[in-house]
Amino acid sequence: SQRAMRLQARVMAMKFHGMRLMSATTSGEDSPLPRLIVKLQTCELNYQLSALAVDVLGELGLLLPDSAEVRSHGTWPRRNMFDIGMIIGGGTAQIQKNIIAERGLGLPREPKLALGESKDKHGL
């Protein structure tokens, strides 16, 4: 499927990006920006891979591990939930993107709203 092929391309890109990071580190060119990007991309990619596995397994992949019909002993649904937790536990994707923008790219901090102030005139 197209989804699987896109994920395969992302896995290969991450592999080569990791090699580039190792090479930069060993040659003394270490920079925080690539490491921040890898952290964000790895969490999201792991989640997308486990979500694909859950989708491929279908409804039988969601059964409890002790059920007679369960596929893969419930490994992929557990992995999928773990990956969601890693995204949340490591800081939400938006927070990670803000860190990359501020620390890695030197962009100004996102403005904070004053107490009681809303984002727009409709209060959304």
What are these language model-derived features?
Residues 1-124:
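Alpha-helical interface subdomain recognition
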